[in-house]
């Protein structure tokens, strides 16, 4: 019994020591990556459109290199120096659904896709992969993100849409604020 407890304790300590620390690899900012998925049902391609920096990160900070859900696409962020996976997420896109239509057999189209990733502290490689319904890789694309790149647009600090909190349950690290539009104008909203 003592031996089983020792082995179990060893595995628990080992699992905890492997956990990534968000602050080791990422800043409290968001990297917005805009891609264009193009093609038809026979051939697909991914193109990088634009990179933007947003003022804060509101996503997960734990289990960063694990997939939260299975999708028909993945984004993998690797530290450029060590090649270690530092962030991974999955998605499903309208482009991949469109590929199963009759229109995709006859014509090629492009679909815009935007993804929000944690902003890396050091240069990182971002890989995006599209899978078929049978989980075969259809196409993939890799690019390097250098956090100090002057071509990364800084957004979200000016020209911010006017807003006010009706209820603020806590800070953004612990709470999610949900806004439900109901077609009010600034003239019909009560002022307090």
Regions found by a protein language model. Name each.
Residues 4-13:
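Sec-dependent N-terminal signal peptides
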Residues 10, 24, 66, 106, ...:
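Sterically constrained small-residue positions within well-ordered secondary structures
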Residues 15-19:
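Sec/Tat signal peptide C-region and signal peptidase I cleavage site
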Residues 20-113:
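N-terminal prosegments of processed precursors
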Residues 80-81, 131-133, 186:
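Short, flexible beta-strand-to-coil junctions
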Residues 115-182:
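Non-catalytic propeptide/linker segments at domain boundaries
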Residues 185-191:
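Conserved small/polar residues in nucleotide/adenosyl-binding loops
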């Amino acid at each position: 019994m003592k031996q089983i407890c020792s082995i179990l304790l060893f595995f628990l300590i080992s699992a905890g020591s492997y956990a990534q620390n968000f602050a080791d690899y990422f800043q409290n900012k968001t990297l917005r990556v805009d891609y264009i998925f193009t093609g038809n049902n026979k051939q697909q391609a991914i193109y990088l459109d634009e990179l933007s920096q947003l003022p804060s990160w509101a996503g997960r900070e734990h289990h960063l290199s694990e997939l939260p859900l299975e999708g028909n696409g993945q984004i993998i962020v690797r530290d450029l120096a060590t090649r270690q996976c530092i962030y991974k997420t999955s998605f499903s896109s309208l482009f991949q659904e469109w590929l199963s239509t009759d229109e995709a057999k006859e014509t090629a189209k492009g679909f815009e896709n935007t993804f929000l990733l944690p902003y890396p502290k050091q240069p990182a490689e971002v890989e995006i992969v599209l899978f078929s319904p049978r989980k075969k890789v259809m196409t993939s694309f890799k690019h390097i993100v250098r956090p100090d790149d002057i071509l990364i647009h800084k957004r979200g600090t000016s020209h911010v849409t006017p807003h006010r909190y009706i209820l603020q349950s806590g800070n953004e690290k612990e709470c999610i604020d949900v806004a439900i539009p109901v077609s009010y104008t600034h003239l019909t909203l009560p002022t307090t």
